[in-house]
Amino acid sequence: YNDFNTYIANIFHCSVFKRDQFLTKLKSYPSQDAGLFEKFKKDILPLKYGFKLGDIEKAAKYIYIETQTFSGMTISEKTKYVDLKGKYKSKYQHLIDKLENPKWQLKIGNITNVENESFETVIKKYDTPDTLFYVDPPYYKMEDYYTKEFGRDQHLQLANELKNIKGKFILSYYVFPQLSEWFPKGKYHWTTKEFSKANSTTSKKKTTSRGEELLIMNFKPALTL
């Protein structure tokens, strides 16, 4: 697993390799607390990348801030706390439950290494004829909703890198005009996949809707993805 956002990579590292200690730290905080939210924002901001993975305290604080907001996509001074007033189960508690779920533990248990590198570095390091890369970049023209490490020009750079690899790739995107130029349908395999996504709700009833993602591959899969 690789993520250029050090905080996200650190969360995965702690979840995989320090799960028990990480869960203990997460459970030591209340599921909602406005004061703690503001304190952790001051501790975390400004975001400083490149620290050594395995920092449980940074992982817990980052998750706490992310799960107390509406979008949970990027953290800044403008990030606002959302008070559920005890009416609904918090996203923070949902995340703890997920980390404790045996199915999730089995899933992330398949991760053997966590990297915090650029896509160029990872491709150069791992590319072989037997490698399969699953690539999930930020949405095109929505990079600012994430963090600042991946700019708009890097979408084209990523496309050029993928078109020249020895191995196989699955690229997750949504449709935008440049994609047909970068990955012509006659040369690359395009398919769509539905997924469930949680809706914002004002009731205790959990609701979901169906979303759709585009998958582009430099091979034709033997099975439907």
Where do the PLM segments sit?
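Long, positively charged, glycine-interspersed low-complexity recognition regions
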Residues: G151-L225
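Glycine-rich phosphate-binding "P-loop"
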Residues: K141-G151
